[in-house]
A protein has these predicted regions:
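C-terminal low-complexity, glycine/proline- and small-hydrophobic-enriched intrinsically disordered tails
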Residues: 51-224
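Acidic, turn-prone loop/beta-hairpin segments
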Residues: 1-81, 101
Length: 224
């Protein structure tokens, strides 16, 4: 039942099932084999599987895809909630978000590492404040507290694993990928995603400078 729910969630998020869905179904049938061998073999054959499913090896890439998707899903949940909060105050049906450069994602990674080491908030602030100040980031204490809150929701261990697998966390790419889902969830007419560092992107409402690690700057307006 849980696997079916996960598959349905995946389809809802991405719209059109792709390679990941096929790999997921393949793994599902492999897991069924010891419990319902005859049904599993029949399904395996219908899906074009080679040989006997009982001898098939479960792909380790499934685990990789799972934790990547989970972190991205939680991140999109956070951004969706932030957009919803802005809309409740200013209204509108068109939203523009500005993401921080992926090169600064190390800040979130560093906070996650500190959290896993058992460091207290005061220690994390003390260790990172100078680096953030040297980068020209204002109010480093507030930034670190905000990032700490988001990392707590994403799961520091899962976020570290995400970085180990993908080498980076590109908020722009993630939000662009799930843009359609956010539009549907919030009933928007449009959602535009920019990198805050993009000189070609209009700085609506001065929201470029509001972009923080894992917390994009958000501007809402009405299309009418």
């Amino acid at each position: 039942i849980k696997m079916l729910e996960d598959l349905e969630t995946y389809v809802k998020w991405v719209g059109t099932p792709g390679k990941a869905a096929i790999e997921y179904l393949n793994t599902w049938v492999k897991l069924m084999s010891p419990i319902t061998p005859f049904i599993a073999e029949e399904l395996w054959s219908l899906m074009g599987g080679h040989g006997y499913v009982a001898k098939a090896v479960i792909d380790k890439e499934l685990t990789r895809g799972d934790h990547l998707f989970e972190v991205e899903q939680r991140y999109v949940d956070i951004v969706t909630d932030d957009i919803r909060s802005v809309l409740e105050v200013v209204g509108g049906d068109t939203v523009v978000v500005y993401t921080l450069d992926k090169e600064l994602a190390w800040i979130a990674k560093k906070v996650a590492e500190e959290m896993l080491s058992g460091a207290e908030m005061s220690d994390i602030i003390r260790r990172l404040s100078r680096e953030l100040t040297e980068l020209g980031i204002r109010q480093p204490d507030r930034v670190i507290r905000t990032v700490h809150e988001v990392v707590s929701y994403l799961g520091p261990e899962k976020l570290i694993k995400y970085f180990e697998t993908s080498k980076e966390f590109d908020e722009f790419s993630v939000l662009t990928k799930y843009r359609g889902l956010i539009v549907t969830r919030l009933g928007l007419k449009d959602l535009v995603v920019y990198r805050a560092s993009d000189p070609r992107a209009p700085d609506l409402g001065g929201r470029k400078s509001r972009a923080l690690p894992l917390k994009p700057g958000i501007y809402a307006t009405s299309s009418t």
